A protein has these predicted regions:
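Preference for protein termini
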Residues: 1-349
Length: 349
C-alpha cells in the first residue's frame, strides 16, 4: 500500500511499539467518552445560540447545519488527538471529527501486527467492529434500495485507501457502495449525481466541510437531497475554534487545555492554530512575547507531548458512533505532528 511511504520513508513503523496497562487504557477511554460528551454539549449550545460566526462559518449555512443537528443526522466517527504521558490526565489537543485519517492503520493493520508479533496479547481496538455496527444503523435509517457513494480526492493514495476501506466496511454491513472522485459528482438541478446521472442519496465524503462550503457548487448543498456522512453539524467539532469554546464552557476541566480567541490571554509560550488547519498545517509554537497571527487563529496552552527515544508521541483516540473505540499512536522527531508522522502500533501489557 503505497500511502505508507512519504518522501521515501515508511509511514507504518514497526521499529517501536507502545505497551499500555489496562488501567491506562481505562483512563484514555473514559477521557475520550467524556470529551465527546462535552463536544456534543458545545454543539447544542452553538446551534441554539446561533453564533456560528465564531467558527468562521458563513451565515448562509447556519440554518442548514442546525437542521442537520436537530434531525439527529448520524456522526459516524472521529479521532481525538490527546497528549498523555501515563500519569497526568489526557489532554485534548483537537478533535478530528470530520475527515480523520490513519483509520486503516488503527482499525486493521495494527491488529494484524498484534496477531503476528504479539500473539496472545490484547489491544484497545474495536474500531472495525463498531464501524460495521454504525453502518448497520445507517442501513436501518435509509431506503434499502439506495446506494452509498464514497468520495474524496481519489488520486491521493491515502485518501483512496481510507475511502476504499470505509466502502468495504459499509458493504460488510449489507449496503451497496460505490466510489467516485469528488470531481466526478454532478448536479442535475435538484440532486447531486454520479457519472451515470443517478441521484446520490447518501454520500460518505473524505473531503473537509470547509472546502465544500467554499466551492462554486456550495449553494446546492442547501437544496439538495443528499444525506452526508459526516453530517454537516460535525464541521463545528473539526473546527479549531471549538477549543476556546469548550474552555469557556468547561473552564478547568482536567481533559481540556486553556484556549482563547485572543493571543493576549497567554503571557508565556503557547500554540497558535489555524481555525481550519489540518495535519499540523497552521500550527505554530509561540515563545513568550511572540505576537503570532491575527487571521482566523486560536491560541491554546502549550502541552508538550511525551518523548520516547527522541520521538514525540501523540495518541489518536477513535470515537465510533458516540463511544471510544480504540487508539493509534503517531510519532515524529518534531513536536508538531504532521502528515508524515509515522504510525506505531500498541498492545496491552
Amino acid at each position: 500500500m503505497d500511502f505508507h511511504t512519504f518522501g521515501g520513508q515508511p509511514y507504518w513503523c514497526e521499529a517501536a511499539c507502545y505497551a499500555f496497562t489496562p488501567a491506562e487504557i481505562d483512563v484514555i477511554e473514559a477521557a475520550t467518552d467524556e470529551l465527546h460528551a462535552l463536544c456534543l454539549e458545545a454543539v447544542e449550545r452553538l446551534i441554539n445560540g446561533g453564533d456560528l460566526e465564531r467558527l468562521a462559518i458563513p451565515e448562509t449555512f447556519w440554518h442548514w447545519i442546525a437542521e442537520s443537528w436537530r434531525r439527529h443526522d448520524p456522526g459516524l466517527f472521529g479521532r481525538f488527538d490527546l497528549a498523555y504521558d501515563g500519569s497526568a490526565p489526557p489532554k485534548m489537543l483537537e478533535y478530528n471529527a470530520d475527515t480523520p485519517t490513519a483509520l486503516l492503520e488503527a482499525a486493521v493493520i495494527q491488529w494484524h501486527w498484534l496477531e503476528e508479533v504479539r500473539p496472545g496479547r490484547d489491544q484497545f481496538n474495536l474500531i472495525h467492529e463498531r464501524l460495521i455496527d454504525e453502518w448497520k444503523a445507517v442501513k436501518a435509517r435509509i431506503n434499502p434500495a439506495w446506494r452509498v457513494y464514497f468520495t474524496g480526492v481519489l488520486d491521493e493514495p491515502e485518501d483512496l485507501g481510507t475511502v476504499e476501506y470505509m466502502r468495504d466496511v459499509c458493504e460488510q454491513a449489507g449496503l451497496a457502495g460505490q466510489s467516485l472522485d469528488i470531481a466526478e459528482i454532478g448536479w442535475d438541478g435538484k440532486d447531486f449525481t454520479d457519472l451515470a446521472g443517478r441521484p446520490i442519496r447518501v454520500l460518505f465524503k473524505l473531503y473537509p466541510w470547509e472546502w465544500l462550503l467554499s466551492e462554486d457548487f456550495a449553494p446546492h448543498l442547501l437544496v439538495g437531497r443528499t444525506a452526508f456522512i459526516e453530517a454537516p453539524w460535525k464541521m463545528l467539532l473539526s473546527n479549531k475554534a471549538i477549543l476556546p469554546i469548550l474552555w469557556e464552557m468547561f473552564p478547568g476541566h482536567p481533559n481540556l487545555l486553556p484556549a482563547s480567541f485572543r493571543r493576549s490571554d497567554f503571557s508565556g509560550p503557547c500554540v497558535q492554530k489555524s481555525v481550519h488547519g489540518r495535519e499540523g498545517d497552521g500550527v505554530c509554537l509561540l515563545a513568550a512575547g511572540d505576537a503570532g497571527s491575527a487571521a482566523q487563529c486560536i491560541w491554546q496552552a502549550l502541552c508538550p507531548l511525551p518523548v520516547f527515544d527522541d520521538q514525540y508521541a501523540i495518541i489518536g483516540s477513535w470515537v465510533v458512533g458516540n463511544k471510544a473505540a480504540g487508539i493509534g499512536i503517531r510519532e515524529d522527531p518534531q513536536p508538531i505532528t504532521g502528515n508524515s508522522s509515522v504510525f506505531v502500533p500498541h498492545y496491552l501489557s
